[in-house]
């Protein structure tokens, strides 16, 4: 895997839905998506599951620790040589 798109998220399932939808229409497909839920009370797991057949996607949920540690958590679990970090509201 050459590229990993890491998406830290906290209580933003609608934004994650829009972001994942935009990734499905990319012509380049050589990337994985790593969504890391940072202790959300409004989870986006259902949204992520809807894209499992169209994206190479992984979902992780962890206790809230803030955006920096959440990005690092995603990076540690990614397989790409290059990391692209996109907040859910990009």
Language-model features and meaning:
Residues 62-78:
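Glycine-rich, basic loop-to-helix element that forms the pyrophosphate-binding segment
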Residues 2-3, 31, 80:
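Local beta-strand N-terminus motif with an aromatic residue
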Residues 11, 23, 38-40, 65, ...:
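Conserved short acidic donor-positioning loop in nucleotide-sugar-dependent glycosyltransferases
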Residues 60, 86-89:
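A broad helix-preferring feature
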Residues 20-61:
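Acidic donor-binding segment of Leloir-type glycosyltransferases
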Residues 1-25:
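N-proximal low-complexity "stem/linker" segments adjacent to membrane-targeting elements
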Residues 83:
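Short aromatic/hydrophobic "clamp" motif used to bind/position activated sugar donors
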């Amino acid at each position: 895997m050459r590229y990993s798109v890491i998406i830290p998220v906290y209580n933003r399932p609608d934004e994650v839905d829009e972001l994942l939808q935009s990734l499905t229409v990319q012509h380049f497909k050589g990337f994985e998506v790593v969504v890391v839920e940072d202790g959300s009370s409004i989870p986006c797991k259902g949204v992520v599951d809807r894209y499992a057949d169209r994206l190479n996607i992984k979902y992780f949920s962890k206790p809230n620790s803030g955006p920096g540690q959440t990005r690092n958590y995603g990076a540690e679990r990614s397989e790409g040589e290059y990391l692209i970090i996109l907040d859910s509201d990009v």
